[in-house]
Amino acid sequence: YSESEEIYLKIVDYIFEQLDNDLAYTKKVYKYMLKGDIINGTQICKLLLEQDIIDIDEEEEQRFLNGSITAYAFMMNRIQNLDITPAQLALDPHSASMVITDVNTGDVLALVSYPGYDNNKMANGVDAEYFNSLLNDQSTPMINYATRQMTAPGSTFKMVSATAGLMEGIITPRSTLFCNGLFDKITPPASCLGRHGSLNVTEAINHSCNMFFYEVGYELGTEGESYSSELGLEKIRNYADLYGLTETTGIEIEESAPTVSTEDAVRSAIGQGTNNFSTVGLARYVTTIANNGTCYNLTLVDKITDRSGIVLTDNHASVRNTINMDSSYWDAIQQGMRKVIESKSYYNDLGVKVAGKTGTAEENKNRGNHALFVCYAPYEQPEIAVATRIAYGYTSTYAARMTKEVLKYYFDLAEEDEVITGTASQIT
């Protein structure tokens, strides 16, 4: 048998071996050292310089070293100039995704996930050291956030509920419901962010009135005098299915399967409950709205060629289903989305009319809300649809502003260097 001291030493060796590979523990050590004034911010900044983690001009480096720039200002400059990226910080928010589709064909024009990695180091033999660094990266760059990350859709889901309400005869384009800020037909009551008074479905989408859609969710589950959440959920699922939100989108790479809510029809009608969708799933959904009801199985593949470039197969997205809905219903929903954008002053100078819907979704009370935005443009004759998500991005305004920059570039309203400036647009 081993002696107790020998066992103790082996346990200690094992613990130290594990701690050497525990990035979370290492971060806690640094945090303890900073809070205990064992090291200070200036020393941390000097480490970044000495280890060549950042590259800055000599003038700023000298100003920092001689004390003309504080450590705080130095770090803010690094973040502002993207010398240190959100992915490197791995603080919220550090990831985002965007999907752009051709609304008339179902082709995926762009599918972007941040952070990413260098494909060149993963081809023709994997760089083992680089691959290991990706596996241990706290920003998880190997996850395709556009296809694999699932979050609640927030208020971007309200067009599904609007469709359900209209097609089930609960509401008409002109009928109104009254919002007093509290829906008390269920226990516990559900609240609205405002007291909107009487509004129709177009105004409810514009103002993102929870109360309006709570009532729709409740009525979907009501037969006679009896309310059944299960019945309401079944109907919500049926209309979510019309927009392709019950299954994967058809793209030729792996994606996570969506979830349509299975609890609380009233709250599910505003995008809460257990609703969970990918960014590419939301892109297919808004594509279907933009083209008045054609739901495509999306595709990433344009054509297949042989080695010499001869086309073997021309590929086209297939139509999954169509939504046969009265044109006045489409008008009511789309006008609501247009009014959403008209209320955003930062879209006034874009030069192309856009229809869209913002959404925020809480997943963790200790972290920021997910920021979501879906849209299509031009409003009168749609060409593209866009879905954007910034995980733990706090406010949907950030997702909407980021999308605006992409729209400017797509519609030739700005040059690439005007959109990609190499600096952060805002630090808060």
Report the location of each language-model feature.
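Beta-lactam-recognizing serine transpeptidase/beta-lactamase-like catalytic domain environment
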Residues: 1-155, 160-392, 428
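Amphipathic oligomerization regions
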Residues: 391-410
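Short, gly/Ser/Thr-rich active-site loops of penicillin-recognizing serine hydrolases
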Residues: 311-312, 316-318, 404-428
